[in-house]
A protein has these predicted regions:
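Positively charged n-region of N-terminal signal peptides that target proteins for export
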Residues: 1-4, 18-20
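Sec-dependent N-terminal signal peptides
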Residues: 4-13
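Flexible, low-complexity junctional segments that flank or bridge functional domains
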Residues: 18-283, 290-292, 297, 312-314, ...
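Active-site-proximal beta-strand/loop segments in catalytic clefts of secreted hydrolases
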Residues: 139, 252-256, 287-291, 317-318, ...
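Gly/Ser/Thr-rich loop/hinge elements
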Residues: 293-338, 342, 346, 376, ...
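Extended C-terminal subregions enriched in glycine
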Residues: 338-360, 365-373
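C-terminal soluble interaction/assembly domains
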Residues: 359, 366-386, 395, 402
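Low-complexity, Gly/Ser/Thr/Pro-rich intrinsically disordered linker/tail segments
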Residues: 409, 413-444
Length: 444
């Protein structure tokens, strides 16, 4: 399924285009106009009711992970939080909790106004949660007082564990999956913070460093470019390498999103497996980490090259993908041994589908963290604009399910070797998952 970004919030769809934003480059012409605007109470109520009606009518299974009574209670509670002094940003925060409660990673409500916030309202450092502890990855303009690796204990007086729990309640994900939220909370932290703290004009943190706890008021950021890691090294999303010494090939696929460009993806896969066969490579690593999905035809084409028997991809025929309901034969040039497949919480949508079929048919060995997707998800999403506030509400409209139906829909694919890097390895940019996999190969 294809990656789709509504401003800066990653949701995914089968047939929408990938959009890019330059919001990481903060400028002085940003404004609070719109996000702090107060609409008439009746306008909020009308938009809220419009969103709920669309959610319940368009979504194929809004009660899959929450009972009808529980969802109705939440809807009523959130509706009652709306007052005549609620800002548009506050209304968005209220609405997000309802949409996130159905546990569908392809459904979200968002606003382009968040992309226009002044830098004073955006948390000015790159951070990452490891479990429930929050660490600085890049202090940006605060490097004179803070360092990467310092642990943040509170932000504007709120414990970071409480903050994480609140943000999780407003982040969409599939089922009861938290690995996907754990990854995305770092990506969207500054926007979630802005909403949670009701768009503050400054941030003060208490930080543990050098054995002491300090309270520090943060400087604004000039830019908020994400912290680069080894996972960003595959610039074109498709990379291949052979290590002849260990007789190991590594195929890196950061996206399946080759809609209308399937020949590019197929040529890459054909080339990889041709070289593997020509060089008589016995060990294969397929790195799918941070692959948030894309075209199901791409997922199936990769699967053909590691399958050892015919398979059917989709459980039911799906518009535009009816061929994937038919029996698909393994590729004669495919890999004959079991590959090692590297996964994490950002493996979503089509990547979850691919992994589910590998798991169901025992075609590979998974290493890393639970995937963000599984054998089923909801997609064919459509954007709707709320009448008064102009918030964008994106709702999934169809169930997309592979034939790996013995798996649970509540969680992602669980790795055979569960491995999550600790803060030291993250700070040192050490690829512990790949290194662990290479050691496994050496022991064989």
């Amino acid at each position: 399924m294809k990656k789709y970004i509504i401003i800066l919030f990653a949701t995914f769809t089968l047939y929408s285009c990938t959009e890019k934003s330059n919001a990481n480059n903060l400028t002085e012409d940003k404004t609070t106009e719109g996000i702090t605007k107060i609409y008439a109470l009746k306008d909020y109520q009308q938009d809220f009711n419009q969103m709920i009606e669309l959610l319940l009518k368009k979504h194929p299974q809004p009660y899959a992970f929450i009972s009808e009574d529980s969802l109705n209670n939440l809807i009523n509670n959130q509706y009652n939080k709306i007052t005549d002094s609620t800002t548009m940003g506050g209304f968005l925060w209220i609405s997000l909790e309802v949409v996130s409660a159905i546990n569908c990673g392809h459904s979200v409500v968002w606003s382009s106004k968040l992309d226009q916030l002044p830098k004073s309202m955006l948390f000015p450092m790159n951070v990452r949660y490891v479990d429930s502890n929050l660490y600085i990855m890049d202090p940006k303009n605060n490097a004179n007082k803070l360092s990467a690796g310092n642990e943040i204990l509170t932000i504007n007086g709120v414990d970071v564990k409480t903050l994480q729990k609140e943000i999780f309640q407003h982040l969409p994900s599939d089922g009861y999956n938290e690995s996907n939220k754990q990854e995305n909370v770092s990506v969207y932290f500054r926007y979630m913070c802005a909403m949670f703290y009701n768009f503050p004009t400054s941030f003060t943190v208490t930080v543990k460093q050098n054995g002491t706890i300090e309270k520090i008021k943060l400087k604004e950021a000039e830019n908020l470019e994400p912290t680069k890691t080894f996972l960003d090294n595959c610039e074109n999303n498709l990379c291949f390498d052979i290590n002849m010494e260990s007789n190991t090939a590594i195929i890196t696929i950061r996206s399946f999103g080759y809609y209308g460009k399937g020949t590019i993806f197929k040529s890459f896969i054909d080339s990889c497996f041709y070289q593997i066969k020509e060089n008589k490579i016995q060990n294969l690593i397929i790195d799918l980490r941070n692959n948030s999905g894309g075209d199901p035809f791409c997922g199936s084409y990769l699967l053909q090259h590691i399958a050892n028997k015919p398979y059917t991809y989709f459980h039911k025929s799906i518009k535009r993908y009816s061929k994937l309901k038919k029996t698909i034969q393994p590729n004669p040039n495919g890999f004959k041994n079991k590959p090692y497949i590297l996964i994490n919480g950002k493996c979503f949508s089509t990547t979850g589908h691919f992994c589910s079929l590998v798991k169901e048919n025992n075609l590979g060995i998974f290493i890393g963290n639970e995937t963000g997707g599984t054998y089923t998800c909801n997609d064919f999403s459509k954007n709707f604009t709320l009448k008064n506030t102009n918030l964008t509400f994106r709702v999934a409209r169809q169930i997309c399910k592979t034939t790996a139906t013995t798996l649970t829909n509540k969680h992602g694919i669980i790795p055979d070797h569960y491995l999550i890097p600790d803060i030291d390895n993250i700070l040192n940019n050490t690829d512990t998952v790949l290194n662990y996999t290479l050691r496994l190969i050496e022991k064989e």
